[in-house]
Every structure is written in C-alpha cells, then in structure tokens.
Amino acid sequence: MTTLKNDRFLRALLREPVDTTPIWMMRQAGRYLPEYRETRSKAGDFLSLCKNTEFACEVTLQPLRRYDLDAAILFSDILTIPDALGLGLYFETGEGPKFHKTVRTEQDVANLPKLNAKADLDYVMNAVSTIRSALGGQVPLIGFSGSPWTLATYMVEGGSSKEFRFTKQMMYAQPEVLHALLDHLADSVIDYLNAQIDAGAQAIQIFDSWGGALAHREYVEFSLNYMKKIIAGLQREKDGRRIPVIVFTKGGGQWLEPMITTGADALGLDWTTPLNTARTTVAGRVALQGNLDPAVLYGSAASIEKAVKAMLDDAYANGEKTGYVANLGHGITQWVDPAQPKIFVDTVHEYSAKYLG
C-alpha cells in the first residue's frame, strides 16, 4: 500500500499533534469550478457523472490541483442507497433530486430489498479504489453516506423538502413504521460504508443534513441512535491505521453532548455554533470540524482572511492544540469565484502555525 505523504487530517481527527491545521471543504468538487462543469458536460448529467469511474475520479481530484487541501472526498451523492433500493432516483433542473417511488407505508418498508453494496453500488466502490490509486498517497480519501434520518426524508417525501410533512406525519402517527425504515437504512449504510473502507476510504463522514429539523427528543430517537448503530457496525481499522468517523448534523450544535455518545471521532459544526463554545463543551473528548459560513467566500480577500483568522482564534482559544480540522459549515456554493477558496485554504495553513508552531 502506498505510504501516505500527508496524514495531518487523519491525525487531527484522532486528536494527535499536527504542524498546521488540516483543511478540506464540503462539496470541494462542484459547480463553482469551470473544470467540473466541463467534465459534467462530457458526462451528460449528474448521475452519469457519479456512475462513470473515470469522471468521478477526475472531479474528485480537480480541487486538489487548485488548492493545498489535506483530504479528498469521494465524488458521489448521498442518495445512491435509496436509488439502489429501487426507488428510481432522477434529477429535474432547478428542483433537485426526486424519486419515482416513495416509502410511506409498512408494506413499502417491507418491500425494500436488502442492500448488497459491493454488488448494487459497485460503481461507487470502483470510484473509491480508482481515486485512492490516483491519489498516490498525496492525501487521505474520505468516504461518506447520508444518515438514516436524512435518507428517509428523501424516500418518504419523494425528493427534497422544507417541511418534511410526510416524514413527520409518519414519525408522530406511525413511529414504528419510521423506525423499521431507519433500521433498514442503518443496516444498508453499515454495509455501504464498510464496502467503501474495503475499497480504500481512509476516513468516513456521515452527513445528517436534516437532523436539525428535529426537536431534541426526536433527534436522539430518530437520528442519533441510528448513527450510533452505524458507527458500532463499522470496520474501524485498515492497513494498520484507525478509520476515523465524522458525524455532521447541520443545525445540530446544541446536541454536541449526546453526539459524543455515537462513538464518532469528530463532530462537524455548521457556522451557527461558536467554535470556542463547542471546544469547551466537548472538552477534548472528540475532535471538531468546521465551520466557516460558505457565504464568507463571496467576500474580498481581506474579509475572507479576517473571518478565517477569527475562526482559528476561536478554535484555539482554550489552549488546545489538537483535535481540529478546518472546513466550511456546509457545502461550497456554485456561485463562488474559484480564486476565493485558495485564500481560505492558504490562510488556514499560514495563520494556524501561530498556534501550532
């Protein structure tokens, strides 16, 4: 196996010393990059881009050619699992993802097949192994999945939603049906992520994008408990190294204490949670990742530098020198000038040396 040349991302997640703060960006391979748009155009559509190993590898590597990033993340979509379960994923321009079928009854849940990730999602595993090989040990590769709760919202609603009407209706009127669906999805995610690890993923992130739509008790019952089940079922070591796991619940900064119980090595934060407060709350028990508002990248070079330095000051305010990975608080948007993320990345590396040097 190729020796990893830059492992500071993995070391930071495990709260080990690093020489400078590692950084990657959620959605770092995306529409803001002209080379991504060109590759997507060649692929024809988004799903074809995800399912073509060569294209998926190319777009994964594109941001690493522009920026001094400390990790690559598999280019794929969180909805690959529901698609493999037979719901029929498709995308409508301007409307986001949709499914031909929904899951709204006990019978719908019972009809879902058992996922065999290595067979049903072989294109994802081919992409992971191809990207890992193409990286040549430059930086670690992150694999990922959506959380059961987040996947369930798309499956029950039939696509994106702001109110989650049908999912919350199920949660309060037929909680046993929702639990059956979430349990099925947790098993599917375990199989999916373990297959990614076998294929070469060196760290895992669970995207709980819609966990923040829940009240506290419901968050624990319908989201957090299933992420805990997943983490307990994951292969945690490969090639002599621990496979760190990051849990990111958007809008979940108030739940850091219960999130620690999931067994995750690190917790992702969005921009609404002050890093210094979060550091005090977790008290060195887990690493933290985040949390620049992606909209900061619309600003001038000076304003980006100022915001990044303030974020780092918060991250290291309590004197801790380990357990922090810089990132955005959510995915980078398509309207960002590709020159701006370089300011973010370079400022993180240069300014953090003040604390870590």
UniProtKB/Swiss-Prot annotation:
Homodimer. One of its GO terms (biological process) is protoporphyrinogen IX biosynthetic process from glutamate. Catalyzes the decarboxylation of four acetate groups of uroporphyrinogen-III to yield coproporphyrinogen-III. Pfam families: URO-D. Pathway: Porphyrin-containing compound metabolism; protoporphyrin-IX biosynthesis; coproporphyrinogen-III from 5-aminolevulinate: step 4/4. Its EC number is 4.1.1.37. InterPro entries: UROD/MetE-like_sf (IPR038071), Uroporphyrinogen_deCO2ase_HemE (IPR006361), Uroporphyrinogen_deCOase (IPR000257). This is Uroporphyrinogen decarboxylase. Keywords: Cytoplasm, Decarboxylase, Lyase, Porphyrin biosynthesis. Coiled coil: none annotated. One of its GO terms (cellular component) is cytosol. Substrate binds at residues 27-31, 77, 154, 209, 330. PROSITE patterns: UROD_1 (PS00906), UROD_2 (PS00907). It is found in: Cytoplasm. It catalyses: uroporphyrinogen III + 4 H(+) = coproporphyrinogen III + 4 CO2. Belongs to the uroporphyrinogen decarboxylase family. One of its GO terms (molecular function) is uroporphyrinogen decarboxylase activity. Its main location: cytoplasm. The record marks 77 as: Transition state stabilizer.
